[in-house]
Amino acid sequence: MKEEMLEVVNNNDVVIGLESRKTIHEKGLLHREIHIWFMTPNREIIFQHRAKDKDTYPDLLDATVGGHVEPGMSYEDTAIKEGEEETGVKINLSKLKLTKKLFKKSFDQVTGRTNNTIRSQYVYLFEGNAGDLRVEEGKAIGFEVWKIDSLRTLGEEDKKRFIAFIFSDEFLDLFEEGQKLLGLK
């Protein structure tokens, strides 16, 4: 299998090189990613349950869609591509809203890898049934729907099922902003 290559960027989001995904995560090199958080008209978020053998954050709940920006692609093009690959949904651009670009550096204690990214965070108004989403084989186990308002008050046992950064004020505020951008609040 051919090794996935990704662009390494500087703090100004300018490409400075090309490295393998493995090397990028082993060395904590800055690279580009996207997240899409599917939100429903009922003010819920649909989380993706990551596969147990993922190289970072295995078996945890994460953004509905996430992916690396491939060489030569834009963040938006990646969101469209990954959205369809990971959920089976053809992304309607009028329902996709950029909330912000974040610099995120996190260390996964389970795998010993560092994810150092500039990540475009999108919200997407999903008006379908979560049960109709297609799971990308090998990448995810399934999807779970959670009320956005419940995230601030989850108990510690429930929180262990998610990637920890989801409960930071930065992300809880992002979810609030996302609801406003989508006209849900």
Residue ranges with predicted function:
Residues D13-V14, R43, G88, G112:
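Detector for glycine-centered tight turns/loop "hinges" at secondary-structure junctions
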Residues K22, P71, K100-K105, Q109, ...:
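Nudix hydrolase/Nudix homology domain
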Residues T23-I34, E44-K81, E85:
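Conserved Nudix-box catalytic region and its N-terminal flanking loop in Nudix hydrolases
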Residues M1-H35, M39-P41:
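Acidic, metal-coordinating catalytic segment for phosphate/diphosphate chemistry
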